[in-house]
Amino acid sequence: MHDQIDDGDRAFIEARDMFFIATTDEDGQPQSSYKGGEPGFVRVLDEKTIAFPLYDGNGMYLTAGNLMTTKKVGLLFIDFEGRKRMRLNGVASVADDDPLLAEFPEAQLIVRVSATEVFPNCPRYIHEYKLVKRSRFVPKRECETPVPQWKQSEWAHDVLPENDPANDPSREVIPRG
């Protein structure tokens, strides 16, 4: 276990297209979430700091809200094909005016995490999976992201922010996602 991100850690993190994130609210209630993007969407900025975008989601902002209040975070990066994983724990900050926002199309916020613990995790029970296809909902610079159909449901309209892409009638809506 170490408190800095070395070159091997950097290469592993920046090659990932997803990770799991754990946070807690001010009452200590845990939340976990999956975050996905194109490989490299998590950036290692220096030996102590990583950054990643938060895209639109279900409108509940549980991850962002928890990071803004308790700041503690646990991240789990997994390479399912190579059967390797690592953990990074740290202290997070969330910003809607971070200069990195310009580098991530459609990102709403940037999370920066200052690493307190970085360590490999036992790969013994990792099931081998093969990537079939990347999600078409991951924002890309060259095209507008379609809206998942679930965002058109009645319950979603109650929680989605006014500026959510689902509220734009000109956006393409597709059934999966």
Predicted feature locations:
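Binding-site signature for planar aromatic cofactors or substrates
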Residues: M1-G177
